Curated annotation (Swiss-Prot):
Record organism: Escherichia coli O6:H1 (strain CFT073 / ATCC 700928 / UPEC)
One BP annotation, GO: carnitine metabolic process
UniProt-recorded name of the protein: Crotonobetaine/carnitine--CoA ligase
EC number: 6.2.1.48
Magnesium found in the keyword field: no
Catalytic activity reported: 4-(trimethylamino)butanoate + ATP + CoA = 4-(trimethylamino)butanoyl-CoA + AMP + diphosphate; crotonobetaine + ATP + CoA = crotonobetainyl-CoA + AMP + diphosphate; (R)-carnitine + ATP + CoA = (R)-carnitinyl-CoA + AMP + diphosphate
Pathway named in the protein's UniProt entry: Amine and polyamine metabolism; carnitine metabolism
Family: Belongs to the ATP-dependent AMP-binding enzyme family.
Amino acid sequence: MDIIGGQHLRQMWDDLADVYGHKTALICESSSGVVNRYSYLELNQEINRTANLFYTLGIRKGDKVALHLDNCPEFIFCWFGLAKIGAIMVPINARLLREESTWILQNSQACLLVTSAQFYPMYQQIQQEDASQLRHICLTDMVLPADDGVSSFTQLKNQQPATLCYAPPLSTDDTAEILFTSGTTSRPKGVVITHYNLRFAGYYSAWQCALRDDDVYLTVMPAFHIDCQCTAAMAAFSAGATFVLVEKYSARAFWGQVQKYRATITECIPMMIRTLMVQPLSANDQQHRLREVMFYLNLSEQEKDAFCERFSVRLLTSYGMTETIVGIIGDRPGDKRRWPSIGRAGFCYEAEIRDDHNRPLPAGELGEICIKGVPGKTIFKEYFLNPKATAKVLEADGWLHTGDTGYRDEEGFFYFVDRRCNMIKRGGENVSCVELENIIATHPKIQDIVVVGIKDSIRDEAIKAFVVLNEGETLSEEEFFCFCEQNMAKFKVPSYLEIRKDLPRNCSGKIIRKNLK
């Protein structure tokens, strides 16, 4: 069954411009308070100009273009401008540092980068010292360095016509995006997302929260994340609604933004809920039009009840990951909700709990949450240039192994228990323990290292490092944290350090992590 009617992203935007015309499509608010608004017609024209910009710079169908940007209109222009000419977006987490960004550039085969002056010095260094296929950089800022191979995105875009100059044949099976996500290994994997995936995500997420064209969907989630793209942006645009993209989350500003834009839908992670709850009580706490707050793991029942009562909202639970594209298990429109259940399988999906031998388990028994979808349509297509990793999680018949532990009840409600893999959930970011351990292990004074997540009242989990030093060495906390800050993104830096004589291991030599939590 073809849910999207064979419609790729170029057709989608041309149709949206025709149908909704001067209706507001996109509102972007920067951290400095600058607000940009675009109608569906204007946004489609900006997307076309951006597509023409890329074509002028030599980008053709199948080429990869990296984006290292905070939330801004240019991200939206690039995302769909690239899709219109069959090129592929590679979004980079805006908080990553040089080594991590270099690795993604190299492994995605990106030949062009769009970024801002804030991140340019890092990429200038990458171009000079690291091997990559990067041949040009576009800066979204008006003031440019006097460097070769650097252009002004805005100036080039404004020189382009508002009609598309290059329209190669497109298929819904074509790749639209490669989104690198942290995994259980030390390196992120490139999740291949097709035009069909994105179109389906729009219809599915709009169905999940019963989105209408008079809705206003506000998000503070970063545009380089699947949540912002597929749960928020694609849903809003597919429904002809208004999408409000705020540059960065601020607990102090959030409810004011919800009220200012008359938002009817938003999305939250636990860190947001906890920081909102510690804000001073206000008479305006319930002065909003929100009917749904899309919510992602994990929150206690007490926290949930307190938040819902104070702000007069209800949470719509949704469970998924980058590989599932959308929240494949969740609360459904018109269906009962059963907290702390993560909901039931959505349309076009099957869900099971399986044991270690890949056999389905009955209700009430713990096992791995597994999802059945159609690769390249309702779930991701594959990991980019990584067939081994793909085969490890995705069976030939479309069953996806999430690596998460849970159970279901007799009525088909699923319950999330824990992450099977060594991942730390920190304020909405997934952090790989193995990745951090490999970085910290390069410190000359450290002999052995293990990283674990410990409970944190605000950010879900804090990161704690246990280290064993080389004989005769001493290591101060200042030296350790300084080393971490220089070698990993800020959100990955451990909060705690404990120096030990040894680490607990089993008979196979593997570290027993549970003994350290």
